[in-house]
Amino acid sequence: TSETLQTCRVDILTQYSLLLTMVSLLEEAVNTLCRIHKDLGQLTTELKDVKGAGLERAARYLKDVVGISGFKDDQSWEYITTIRDCRNMVVHNGGRIKDDFKPKCDKFNIGYREEDSQLYIEYADVMKFYEAILDFMDRAFRLEPSTSTQP
């Protein structure tokens, strides 16, 4: 019925909205981590001075400028970047999963419809993403520089 179809559309829009919001907050938290280390270490190099974008740029900044090498070594880095990639599929591809990304979705049990490769996430998936992001950031904020860096 049209009511069922409407409910399905609202549900997927809600899950997509939560995914987009979570990844935006993740990226802002990582950027904040970089700013904190810049200020605490009295560093002259800023995050914007490092090539790249998003999580990879922040990881490069933390490693090369701050001296934290463990950020990308975290046990859930691959899962976190897969969540980010799902967000990118929603934003840039209408929620359609590209064929080369399907193995990652399969590895982490992230659903998509076989017939049209549409990303299919439920509330339980969103909660798993949320918990993984919180755990990752908790560990990230505990990392300390292992090398001395000069401002």
Regions found by a protein language model. Name each.
Residues 20, 28-115, 120:
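Flexible secondary-structure boundary motifs
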Residues 1-15:
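Charged alpha-helical initiation segments
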Residues 103-151:
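Amphipathic, Lys/Arg-enriched alpha-helical patches that create a basic surface
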Residues 21, 25, 82-85, 89, ...:
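Charged, amphipathic alpha-helical oligomerization/scaffolding segments
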Residues 11, 15-19, 122, 126-129:
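Aromatic-acidic/polar surface patches that form glycan- and anion
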